Structures are given as C-alpha cells and as structure tokens.
Amino acid sequence: MKLKINFVDFWPNFIPTDNYFYHLLSTKYDVEIDESPDILFYADFENSNLSHEAQRKVYYTGENKRPNFDECDFAFSFDYSDNPKNYRLPLWVLWINWFDVPHSEERDVSYLTPLNNLIGPRKASKKQKFCNFVFSNHTGIRVPLLNEI
C-alpha cells in the first residue's frame, strides 16, 4: 500500500528519506515523499506547517515544547501526557539504528547503535572523554555557546 508523506520545519540537513519516521513507515508501506501528503510530519524549526495541507498532521519535537493539539492530529514528544494523541518518543530513541540502515554517503550512521548490539550482556568500556550540554529551545546564548563547544 502506498503512503504519501512529507516533512517540514525540521532541523537543517534533515534528510526526508533517511530518518526514524520514514524507515518505520517503510516497514509496512510503500512510502513516497510528496508535496500533497497523506501525512505531514512537522517540527518546530519554522512555522511553514501552517500553510501546508495534509490529511493528517503529525508534530515531532525533541525540544522542551508541548504539542499544540489545535494544530496537529497526533504528536511525538518527550512529554509524559495523558492525551491519547501524544506518544512519548524521547530524542535518544532516534539515535538507535532500529532498521539496520546501512552507511551511506549522504549520512554517516556509524554513530548509531545497531539494535543487535543492545541485546545481551553489556560490556564495560573505559570512557576516555565526555562532554554534555543540555538546553531547552534555541534562544538566547545557547546556540552560540553550543557552536563554540
């Protein structure tokens, strides 16, 4: 069965044919990127989703923002919510190679953890270096600070 989808308002360098949602839907559907989609996925990096028509709009955020259910039919977010239109999908979930996506020139997926490596006992490894920077929303000095790190 064919399913037409599209993505708008995602981060720079987002690849519509190489992401969690595309690969997930491709396991059950013949997925096609289309300007008149059945499902429009949108994030919070722009506001062009408001001008797009689609049978269904699905909001995704990895930011500390709650979905506006007046604008979307369904949402994937970090939020614990009792709303049946919201599915909790923390950002870390997208960093696992659930679909065994091969390495490609367009996107280096070598940093992803293959699903098979998550099964069985964990092997301890000595960590050499670690850096963590957590922030919510891209305002103020946060983005320039992140770029300096």
Briefly describe each language-model feature range.
Residues M1-I149:
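Nucleotide-sugar donor-binding catalytic core of glycosyltransferases
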